[in-house]
Amino acid sequence: MKKTEKVKFIINTLEDLYPKVEVPLNHKDPYTLLIAVLLSAQSTDAGVNKITPKLFAIADNPYDMIKMSIDEIREIIRPVGLSPMKSKGIYGLSKILIEKHDGKVPKNLKDLEELPAVGHKTASVVISQAFGIPAFPVDTHIHRLMFRWGLSTGKSVKKTEEDAKRIFPKNLWNKLHIQIIYYGREFCPARGWNFKNDIITQKIGRKSVIKKFLI
């Protein structure tokens, strides 16, 4: 199957399975999305969604957030892990948003990536899902599936993102990256993978991946 045919099959299959998708992290505006995505690093969306209601009930904007101490933030977010780093990041970025951006979340990668504890993936999620700017954030699910589907080498997340942007239509990026995450969780996980249920990998998967499973 040609790569263009693979891409068309992936897009059509994901659209059939997930015609409507939402960001898995609960939020109400760009700031709360930014905080939620930051918290999700090396954690689960479900875990983040359990603690953000308590945090946002106290502070759902940078002005209220810096009224809290780093220790107070840390105590609330402790269950999601990496709380020392994340609490400092939340406090620090909130302060910078007030000082440099009038308390608003910037709409570009450069300014977002200059904020404490905000990496490229986090920034990409924010511009994509908060502002509708085309981006293709790559998480572990997308990185894994792009390799299994033979669409990227799997050498690095950066390479996977470059390949995804080159292969998939730009107007689909914002929805498609979430659809792939949904599919990865449901049909193509890193552990407990049931190849018989994975209709996309069965159809267009990398030969070495399929062969390894069948042996």
Regions found by a protein language model. Name each.
Residues 2-215:
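Catalytic cores of DNA base-excision repair glycosylases
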